[in-house]
């Protein structure tokens, strides 16, 4: 089992997670998709060097790359994954919500920030499910923790994604 192998990072329920802080390796692979991960899309894009550099040339490409990364992560973790992008500055924007592979993508409506939408989602979902919010926005982390969510910084989430990718390479992509 994954949670007994050395080098996989702390387990769910380790001290940082008990305080509402998720650390890389804190998630263990689930059999059913009862856990939720809500990602502040632009916060992650601008926190990860490769995505930030891509966004400087083409923001659509950076969003697409992030959605591909999140889709792979979701497939391994078997969680409900929602990525939220700000659309609040776009005039007459009614917002949009659509599936992308097995993740859900949300563009907020005019006047609604990603932070506000994430807070609303967290409030609704955290009553019945474990929710991890991925953002490096300090205020957002505090607010969502107050609603029962676990927080994970964008930088720590990058390390978590890299750990998952390494595990996939080691265990599923071997050329026997």
Show where each model-derived region lies.
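Nuclease catalytic cores that cleave nucleic-acid phosphodiester bonds
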Residues: 1, 15, 19, 26-39, ...
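Conserved P-loop NTPase mechanochemical-coupling segment
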Residues: 3-14
């Amino acid at each position: 089992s994954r949670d007994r192998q050395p080098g996989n990072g702390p387990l769910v329920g380790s001290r940082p997670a008990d305080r509402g802080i998720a650390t890389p390796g804190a998630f263990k692979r689930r059999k059913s998709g009862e856990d939720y991960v809500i990602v502040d899309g632009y916060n992650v894009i601008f926190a990860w060097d490769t995505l930030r550099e891509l966004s400087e040339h083409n923001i659509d490409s950076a969003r697409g790359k992030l959605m591909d990364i999140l889709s792979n992560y979701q497939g391994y973790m078997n969680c409900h994954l929602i990525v939220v992008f700000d659309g609040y500055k776009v005039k007459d924007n009614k917002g949009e919500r659509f599936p992308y592979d097995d993740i859900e993508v949300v563009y907020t409506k005019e006047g609604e920030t990603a932070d506000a939408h994430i807070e609303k989602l967290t409030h609704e979902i955290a009553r019945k499910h474990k929710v991890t919010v991925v953002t490096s926005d300090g205020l957002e982390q505090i607010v969502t923790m107050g609603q029962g969510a676990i927080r994970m910084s964008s930088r720590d989430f990058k390390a978590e994604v890299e750990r998952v990718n390494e595990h996939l390479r080691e265990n599923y992509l071997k050329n026997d």
